[in-house]
C-alpha cells in the first residue's frame, strides 16, 4: 500500500531539483524488487522513492533480480521495472547491462545495498548514490554458512569494509 503522493508543488520542486542537477533519467539497482516474495522494508522504501521521482517527471528504471510469477519487464507507478538474472547473478549482469547501455541512457544511479553491493564506483561514470537500509552482520553466516561458507565470508567482509 502506497502513501499519498506529495502535493503538486512539492513534486514540481523535486522535478526542478532533478532537472537542475541534470538528472532526467535515473537507474536504480537492487537485489530484489517489490514483487519478490522476500521483499521487505528496503524494497518498500525504494519503491516509494521511485514512485515519487516518476511522479515528479524523472524517467526511472529499476533493475533487480527475477521475481517468480512476474514479467521480466513491467511498469509500476510510472517507472519501469526490469527483473532479470538470479539471486547472485543480478550483480554482475546489472553492471554489464549498465556498461553496455542495454536499459537505455542514465544521468544518475541509485544503488540499493542489501548486503552485497553492485560496486558501482568501479564501473559507473556519473552521479551515483548508495542507499543502505541496514547491515546484515551475522545474517551472512546464518543464511549462507552451511550452503556456501565462502560466499558468507565474502559478504561479511565486504559489508564490514
PLM regions and their residue ranges:
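An aromatic- and histidine-rich active-site surface loop
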Residues: 90-94, 98, 107-139, 155
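A short, charged, and often flexible helix/loop element on the N-terminal side
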Residues: 72-102, 141-147
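A short, glycine/small-residue-rich beta-strand->loop->alpha-helix junction that serves as a flexible
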Residues: 31-45
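Local beta-strand N-terminus motif with an aromatic residue
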Residues: 23, 105-107
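N-terminal strand-loop element at the rim of the active site
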Residues: 4-19, 23, 32-36, 52-86
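Membrane-proximal helix-turn-helix segments that form the acceptor-binding/catalytic region
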Residues: 148-161
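A short acidic, helix-capping loop that chelates divalent metal ions and anchors anionic groups
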Residues: 35, 138-142
Amino acid at each position: 500500500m502506497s502513501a499519498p503522493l506529495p502535493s503538486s508543488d512539492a513534486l514540481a520542486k523535486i522535478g526542478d531539483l532533478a532537472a537542475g542537477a541534470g538528472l532526467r533519467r535515473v537507474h536504480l539497482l537492487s537485489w530484489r524488487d517489490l514483487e519478490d516474495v522476500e521483499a521487505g522494508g528496503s524494497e518498500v522504501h525504494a519503491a516509494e522513492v521511485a514512485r515519487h521521482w516518476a511522479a515528479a517527471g524523472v524517467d526511472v528504471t529499476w533493475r533487480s533480480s527475477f521475481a517468480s510469477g512476474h514479467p521480466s519487464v513491467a511498469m509500476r507507478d510510472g517507472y519501469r521495472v526490469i527483473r532479470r538474472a538470479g539471486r547472485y547473478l543480478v550483480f554482475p549482469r546489472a553492471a554489464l547491462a549498465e556498461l553496455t547501455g542495454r536499459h537505455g541512457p542514465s544521468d544518475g544511479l541509485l544503488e540499493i545495498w542489501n548486503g552485497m553491493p553492485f560496486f558501482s564506483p568501479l564501473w559507473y561514470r556519473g552521479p551515483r548514490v548508495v542507499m543502505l537500509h541496514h547491515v546484515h552482520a551475522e545474517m551472512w553466516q546464518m543464511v549462507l554458512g552451511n550452503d556456501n561458507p565462502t560466499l558468507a565470508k565474502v559478504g561479511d567482509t565486504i559489508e564490514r569494509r
